[in-house]
């Protein structure tokens, strides 16, 4: 058995070793002072995801202003739409796949996000190919690279949910959660 002072010294030396920082990703929320709309951002292990509420009338205006068939504009109704920005802040290659992401409503039900290929296939049947507006369904990108576009969930305006998402970094899959998100209201909120 080691003498008591040797054990104490060992414990003391262990206490001096650097402890790796425990990673705690923080969700930030901001309210636009002019529109009253909300935006959320979370950076977790170098994967940055930002979601910005978009009013249904704004989304309709974006598609209408491109002289797209009315059926394309109407296809977006009934969807909760966010302006989305994904950025790699990791120092290595990241990739993601929107088809793996889910919105979980307070009743526990999981809702798929509609992906860019699904929208493009639907819009082609309606006489349009306007896929550039939707967040790429998959991406693999280096440090500093980013992707942006609309993300869509078939939920009514004002719906609340948590977003479960995932990404890969150095071949390892990570999962994240953005809690207490809300679809934009049907009408603009009153500015505070």
Q: What residue ranges belong to the model's regions?
A:
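N-terminal secretory signal peptides that target proteins for export/translocation
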Residues: 1-7
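Bacterial N-terminal signal peptides
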Residues: 9-19
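Conserved functional micro-motifs across diverse proteins
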Residues: 24-192
């Amino acid at each position: 058995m080691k003498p008591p002072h040797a054990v104490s010294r060992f414990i003391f030396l262990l206490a001096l070793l650097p402890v790796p920082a425990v990673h705690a990703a923080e969700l930030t929320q901001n309210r636009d002072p002019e529109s009253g709309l909300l935006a959320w951002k979370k950076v977790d292990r170098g994967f940055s995801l930002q979601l910005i509420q978009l009013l249904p009338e704004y989304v309709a205006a974006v598609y209408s202003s491109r002289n797209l068939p009315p059926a394309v504009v109407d296809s977006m109704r009934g969807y909760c739409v966010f302006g989305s920005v994904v950025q790699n802040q990791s120092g290595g290659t990241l990739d993601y796949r929107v088809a793996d992401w889910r919105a979980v409503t307070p009743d526990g039900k999981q809702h798929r996000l509609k992906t860019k290929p699904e929208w493009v296939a639907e819009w082609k049947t309606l006489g349009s190919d306007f896929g550039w507006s939707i967040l790429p369904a998959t991406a693999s990108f280096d440090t500093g690279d980013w992707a942006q576009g609309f993300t869509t969930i078939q939920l009514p305006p004002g719906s609340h949910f948590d977003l479960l998402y995932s990404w890969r970094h150095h071949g390892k899959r990570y999962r994240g959660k953005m809690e207490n998100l809300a679809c934009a209201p049907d009408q603009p909120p009153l500015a505070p």
